[in-house]
Amino acid sequence: MKIRAAVLVAPGRYEVQTFDRPKLEDGALLMRVELSGICGTDKHTYQGETKQYAGTESETDTPFPIIQGHENVGIIEELSPALEESGDFYQAPVKVGDRIVMCPDMICGKCFYCTHIQGYSWCSKSQCYGNSFTSAQWPHLLGGWAEYMYFKPGTFFYKVPENIPPKVAVLAELMACAASLDKLKDFSSYSIEGFTTGDTVVVFGVGPLGLLHLAKLGIMGAGKIICFDKSDYRLELAKKFGADLTINVDKT
């Protein structure tokens, strides 16, 4: 079986390449990709900004050629026996044909940050699907801009409820970025800083990430929500997502 992928062979240059279907390691799976988002990081890499995790202990250079895509949803095509037993991140049973989403970062579980604090965001050896793995080496298919994607052993993934369509599930990774609001609310529980119920909040920019932060703010009980952007179209969407006041900065 040959699998096609959009490969970024160098900044500014994509090629459609084909790869053999990889044989699964124990603890791995193969996902048929339904949708994969285009992140700002993908654009920067295409433009030649090739530092990943810049300024952190995980800083690396993008290993071209690479298959991008870390905002992914798809259907389990093949599942190793180990995962049939262990299930997804929450140990929910999974099988071939189930829809899943993934955490794009792979953490080591052994560094100071992994063993002393919530390691997912801070791991000093973090690697990211679509950003950290070259397609020149087996198993090749380590990004979502391909017909199929390989999940290495240790990848966090989640079964998607049947009532959630792929066009919504693909936003899971973006929504996870709104976890910063959870941290801010945590801070407010033991200091006067942070964010708490009823606070007025300003959102600068209402692209996909801004809109999902806006949705999360509504869920968390924000008071007045004010949004700034240059696009009237996006500001209209922001109103539908619950913004109380929208301001076009180019018209102010």
Give residue spans per PLM region.
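Hydrophobic/small residue at the entry helix of a nucleotide-binding pocket
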Residues: 177, 209, 217
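Adenosine-nucleotide cofactor-binding segment
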Residues: 197-206, 218-252
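Conserved Rossmann-like nucleotide-cofactor binding loop
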Residues: 39, 209, 233
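Extreme N-terminal starter segment of soluble prokaryotic enzymes
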Residues: 2-4
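Glycine-rich beta-strand-centered segment in the early N-terminal region that forms part
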Residues: 22-36, 51-115, 141-142, 161-163
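Short Gly/aromatic-enriched secondary-structure transition segments
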Residues: 44-51
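NAD(P)H dinucleotide-binding glycine-rich loop of Rossmann-like/cofactor-binding domains
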Residues: 58-65, 70, 86-88, 108-204
